[in-house]
Amino acid sequence: MNSKFIERHEIKLSETHSKMIISGWGKDAFENSVVERITYLSDGLKVKGYLAYPKDHSKKYPSVIWCRGGAGNKGAIDTFTARGIYGQLASWGYCVFASQYRGNAGSEGHDEVGGSDVNDILNLIPLADEIPQANGNLWGIEGWSRGGMMTFLTLQRNHNFKCAVLVGAISNVEEYANKNTKLKSYYENLIGKEKLEQELGKRSAINFVNELPKIPYLLIHGAADDTVSPMQSIELVEKFNEYDIPHKLVLPENGDHFLRKNRKEVDELRKDWYEKYLKKKRPEDRS
């Protein structure tokens, strides 16, 4: 089998940075996980990303795709942050796959922010076949901010995920772009003004809820988020109700876009969600 991986390098941190990881994400996140920088093939492009997995290789673990926020290099995940975020998730008992998206952090191609870059997420899936401890048949997906949009676009095209976690997710891209002049200019330069409304509509989950799989969705959105309005998640949930899509909406009081003051609550919600839907046996999972 031809490998989809081009490069894999384990992240090694200085003693000072290692202590900072333990302080910020916990001892387990550092001691019980391995996080790697990877380069993989996506539509013939060399794309950068990350891979994380538990140190214990004695069994297989559910797989989770984690979708970053930001556009271009703004929001790209550096190695220190990756060691914390992905190491924590791996320490909970998951194999984690994450993309920087094409055109970013040294990746080839150009970031279309919800266009062909969605393939960079879908092309993470076959990588699980090359990780012995990864269960490539049991997937969850998580997205923050722009990563929420990417998560919805991925789920529109692939219904093989068991659950999803969305944090501060953009579900109405047109509305968000109208309030974010930098992003709107980015899209105008990328798409052109003539097709702008049409293309932003295609990227907006609020317009294709009926095409999403009916899996359990955890939506967390800071009630005081002034970057992506919590109304984006509130209005999406109204659509979820119309189509009987199972979900839980949590609006942490005084929570900002990054939920800095709510990290413990958010981590517990995420951990419990994955535990419930990726690990606990349900009747439909039994053979």
Question: Residue ranges of each PLM-predicted region?
Answer:
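N-terminal cap/lid segment of alpha/beta-hydrolase-fold proteins
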Residues: 13-58
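Short substrate-entry loop that stabilizes the transition state in hydrolases
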Residues: 57-61, 66-109
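C-terminal catalytic histidine-bearing segment of alpha/beta-hydrolase fold enzymes
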Residues: 68, 234-287
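Mobile cap/lid helix-loop segments that gate and shape the active-site cleft of serine hydrolases
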Residues: 76, 169, 173-214
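Alpha/beta-hydrolase active-site loop
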Residues: 112-132
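Alpha/beta-hydrolase fold nucleophile elbow
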Residues: 133-145
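Short glycine-enriched nucleophile-adjacent loop
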Residues: 148-159
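Short beta-strand/loop motif that positions the catalytic acidic residue
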Residues: 212-213, 219-221, 225
